[in-house]
Amino acid sequence: MSTLKIESTDLPKYLLLILYIITGSLSNYGAIDILAPQWIYLGAINILSCLYFLFFSPNTLSTAFRPLFKSVFIYLYLFYIVWNALSYFYAINPVETLINLPRVGNTFFAIFFCYFLIYNLPNKFFFISRLFLLFLIAELAAYYNDFVTVYPKEGLNVIAIKGFAGNKNITAASIAFKLPFVLYLLHSLKRPLYRFGLVVVLFGGVLAVSLIEARAAILSSLVVFLLFLLFQVYLLVIKHYTIQKGLINIGLTILPYLIALFFNLTLSSTANKGAITDTVGRIAFTEESSNGRFQYWGDALDYVKKHPIFASGLGNWKIASISQGKEHISGYTVPYHAHNDFIHVFTETGILGGLAYIGLFVCLTFYLLILLYNKYKAQGILELQYFFLLLPFIVYGIDAGLNFPVARPLMQSSLALFAGLILGLYLDTNNKEQPILSPKPLLQKSILALILLLLIPGLAVHIISFRSLQKQGPLLYEFNNAQYNLTRAQLDDISHDFPNLTETAMPIKSMKARYYYLQGNKEEAHKMALEGSKDNPQIFFGENLKAQFLLQEGKIDSAYVYAKKAFEGLPNNMPHYDMYMKTLVAKREVTTIDEVFETVRALAGDTKIIWTIYIRSLAQTRSLGDPFAMDKAATAYQLYPKDETIFSLYRMLTYGQQRMVEAEQLNVQAAEAYNNKDFITAARLFQQCFDKDPMQHTYSLNAGLAFYEGKQFDQAIQYFDLALTSKNEDTKERALRYKGLSLYQAGRGPQACAVFLKLKNQYPKRMYQQEFQKYCFSNTNN
């Protein structure tokens, strides 16, 4: 391998390439998503590159410009960009298209400029490999810095240990993407010290991927590992390596993986977490193991069938996905990405945009295969570096098929360098074989000037979006915690026009409406609630909010209309279900209440919240002792015997709230008597409590305890037996213990011992073991 020589005239190119690769190292700077400042940075580097080529590097343009514009790739990409821009005219929310278009353009121009920067460099592949290696070392340093901070306190908390990236999947994918370049350098460099260092980096990368538990990254890393081993066997046979050399090459690859596996098993065992072997065992292309991806893909493909040409519009799948998946969206967390970049593009730009996007990767694959074939044809053997170029492509492809790297600047900056390298290698080779005349300098300058004019407003959009994401944080925090403390001045500081949706697709106007209503600006609140619905017409948050306002104002029929619309739009959304039920209660629509419950139950299953809302609605609309209502309440209580709300509603439907209130009032008197040592009076009052509220076994337990303290042991036993029928384990445990003590005090030793034996077996506590020994072996009982 030749050494890397850097000419002084090429220094700006190397510097710009370094600036591209560090895109993913930026923090969030107060924004709710780390991508916002990274898009700004990537846009700024594109502008810097454009200025460099426009004013300082005409030679690069003269040699690299025309080959690119003779390729299919550039025209396919230009069509893709233009079609994305045209989606503004049919997008559900055109503002989202304007916000996302500069992101698509950023990746395009990053590839465009990386190609220009790489095209004339000597040893292109070697330099880019080293560049990826250096950034990987930085990524691993950040990851393990988090690791040593988090692990002693929280163990293998993969959510908290994330390095540069915003989440674990991005961290793992980014590391996995760069590992093939480490393998390439490991088998290209010959100095022992270099190779040792690369083995350490490879070990650190593989261990990080295994600990993060991101299955897509683990799968792609395993594929890379197996393909590389097969390639080593191929070289051993074709190149006739000695057994010693072949084993060294294979050993240098296997050793870091084996050591990483050992460390993974050790750390996972220490932290009581699943090891990588468990994660690999869960890799399967089934609905159960896909974390909902099959559902996302099915919804997305169904949408494309319905909208083959004019789909949702760039950036609008997070809106369109709501109506597609409305039966399994239980809150306001929407599937804003299809978890497959290729399918996702189809959902936003239709068949034309989707095919163009796939075509870009087909082109790059074709260029790689041509490079491999030409080298094989010339040398009779597969070229090492071109084979290695296939491996990160596989990693990116698997990640794009299961996640959404297209939305992450960390992955897009790496893709830009990688695609620029492939284009540089392929077009440089073809250009040498078939010389192409350079275009006129004026045309080159004009194109770059046009690009600059596009990049500057794109950067402005990124900055506006970033500032909005900074300010959305408090708004989303209060929304998620049902707190509404922001002042009018703070609300006015958050733009609701551009962007008009939060990062989670919530309409900002509607979110502000709740504050306005609470602050007394009711007319404005009503208006803003519905204005927000225009920005995201699929989430029905504004309609549900409008129903709340109207119900509070006593306008039941109007509230019902909006609540019904919100419920039918998202029937599995619990706030919508709750509000619709409240309006049905207000209208006394008893039959519809049952129908709505069964509809939601079929979607959500027997969850506690749907039963609670339903039983509450029955309690407000059915008469006392209604057999149907009591039967439903009993079913809910059987499902959730420990839930106090359901238990209270069950009792309310059975014998009425008045008796429950009277029992609570008597309970206060009983507790006062008990505290004053008037145990028999307390016991009689607790008896009355239990007579009025016989399902509340706390009263029977307290009656038993009062009789016990009053030395009325037979009566105490009677009430402890009643308490033992409770579904509350704490109540049953105390009742069983004091029954044993009462039996012992009543002189019924054998019966007491039987109870103590049951107590220590059913509730294995040291105290009960000691009491069993004390009362059943230390003394002689009657």
Provide a role label for each language-model segment.
Residues 4, 10-27, 45-53, 81-88, ...:
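Alpha-helical transmembrane segments of multi-pass inner-membrane proteins
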Residues 469, 507, 541, 575, ...:
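Start-of-helix register in tetratricopeptide repeats
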Residues 499-503, 537, 571-572, 605-606, ...:
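Short coil turns that delineate tetratricopeptide repeat
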Residues 292-335, 342-345, 349-356:
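TM-adjacent membrane-interface loops and short helices in multi-pass inner/ER membrane proteins
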Residues 1-85, 94-99, 106-133, 185-196, ...:
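Transmembrane signal-anchor hairpin modules in multi-pass inner-membrane enzymes, especially those
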Residues 146, 211-212, 217, 232-289, ...:
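A membrane-periplasm/extracellular boundary helix in multi-pass inner-membrane enzymes
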Residues 512-516, 528, 543-550, 562, ...:
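TPR/Sel1-like alpha-solenoid repeat signature
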